[in-house]
């Protein structure tokens, strides 16, 4: 069983040309977060983050094909600028009033590498392989936008 869970947990690592404090703050300051969160082609329509252990977050977006999605979760660990952990689940049809789907956990570590930051994200375990791969693509696109945001605001 553990082997299945391991193949359905993403591990992504990227080096960002910014200090751990700047990268961490891009995750926890709402007006910064909305500028890069979600992959290209998705417009954030609503975002609320209450970054503290036990605090909630939710985000609603619209993709190019007109599909609305909504996700939400709870912050579990907030250790600036070292670690961030929160739960994650999608809502059916982009409606917060509808039940949440399969819940996963997002764990992020921020490590100084000179004046840069190595960010490692673990997200999962997912219910199936298509969901795992879809989130891999989503995080990859979001990280590209985060990189551009950090460059633009340096």
Predicted regions and their residues:
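Hydrophobic ligand-binding cavity/cleft-lining segments
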Residues: 1-43
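Hydrophobic beta-strand positions in extracellular immunoglobulin-like domains
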Residues: 16, 123-125
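Structural signal for well-ordered, non-membrane alpha-helices
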Residues: 24, 34, 83, 140-143, ...
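Short, surface-exposed helix/turn micro-motifs that flank interaction/cofactor sites
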Residues: 24-25, 76, 111, 140
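Tryptophan-centric aromatic hotspots in well-structured domains and transmembrane helices
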Residues: 27, 88-90, 139, 143
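Hydrophobic-ligand binding "helix-grip"
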Residues: 34, 39, 47-53, 58, ...
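Well-ordered alpha/beta subsegment
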Residues: 117-121
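A conserved amphipathic terminal alpha-helix motif
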Residues: 125-154
């Amino acid at each position: 069983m553990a082997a299945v869970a391991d193949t359905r947990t993403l591990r992504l690592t990227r080096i960002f040309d910014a200090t751990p404090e700047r990268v961490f703050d891009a995750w926890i300051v709402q007006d910064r977060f909305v500028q890069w969160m979600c992959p290209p082609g998705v417009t954030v329509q609503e975002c609320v983050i209450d970054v503290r252990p036990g605090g909630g977050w939710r985000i609603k977006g619209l993709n190019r094909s007109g599909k609305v999605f909504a996700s939400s979760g709870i912050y579990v660990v907030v250790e600036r600028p070292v670690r961030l952990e929160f739960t994650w689940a999608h809502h059916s049809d982009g409606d917060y009033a509808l039940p949440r789907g399969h819940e996963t956990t997002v764990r992020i570590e921020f490590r100084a590498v000179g004046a840069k930051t190595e960010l490692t994200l673990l997200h999962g375990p997912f219910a199936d392989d298509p969901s795992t791969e879809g989130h891999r693509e989503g995080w990859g696109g979001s990280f590209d936008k985060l990189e551009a945001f950090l460059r633009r605001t340096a």
